[in-house]
């Protein structure tokens, strides 16, 4: 079954991820499984993954999808803006976002949730879609809860 055919609720997705991260102590393994669950469960997306803070930039972490940009400066693009502003960025049309970084020209909308612990940005969760205005309030809330689950694990 392909990702667009799945009809999982946000509660189903959260439950699946919660079970995975509760059983694993390695953050890379947890991020890899979270990216896989989201990529398979969320319809109409073309990329799901993480960028991790390394010095003053975000570096590509575990993901599902096409080849991605490997380094993103803080404050640049949707991911860098989420890290700089320390808040979720939900962009309906990435082509109208100032400084958008087109890692995949097929992407039309994007949502990025920062990973923040004790006031420190550790990285971001990034989800892209080829559909304009793909992400809504319900998915934003769910993705923010996914990040909270990850941060409560042994991250």
Which functions belong to the PLM regions below?
Residues 116-129:
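Sensory-domain boundary capping and coupling elements
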Residues 47, 112, 124:
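Short hydrophobic/aromatic beta-strand element in the GNAT-like acyltransferase core
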Residues 42, 103-107:
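Short loop/turn motifs at secondary-structure junctions and domain boundaries
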Residues 109-116:
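A short, aliphatic-rich beta-strand micro-motif
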Residues 131-133:
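A generic structural motif
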Residues 1-62, 66, 145, 149-154:
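Intrinsically disordered, low-complexity terminal regulatory regions
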Residues 53-103:
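Regulatory sensory and allosteric helical modules in signal-transduction proteins
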Residues 135-142, 152-153:
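Well-ordered alpha/beta subsegment
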């Amino acid at each position: 079954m392909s990702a667009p055919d799945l009809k999982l609720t946000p509660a189903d997705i959260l439950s699946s991820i919660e079970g995975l991260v509760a059983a694993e102590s390695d953050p890379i393994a947890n991020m890899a499984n979270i990216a896989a669950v989201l990529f398979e469960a969320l319809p109409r997306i073309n990329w799901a993954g993480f960028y991790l803070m390394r010095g003053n930039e975000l570096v590509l972490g575990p993901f599902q999808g096409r080849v991605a940009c490997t380094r993103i400066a803080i404050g640049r693009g949707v991911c860098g803006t989420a890290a700089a502003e320390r808040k979720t960025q939900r962009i309906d049309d990435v082509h109208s976002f100032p400084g958008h970084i087109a890692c995949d020209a097929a992407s039309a909308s994007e949502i990025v949730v920062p990973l923040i612990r004790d006031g420190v940005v550790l990285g971001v969760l990034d989800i892209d879609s080829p559909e304009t205005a793909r992400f809504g309030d319900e998915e934003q809330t769910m993705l923010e809860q996914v990040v909270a689950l990850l941060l409560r694990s042994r991250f």
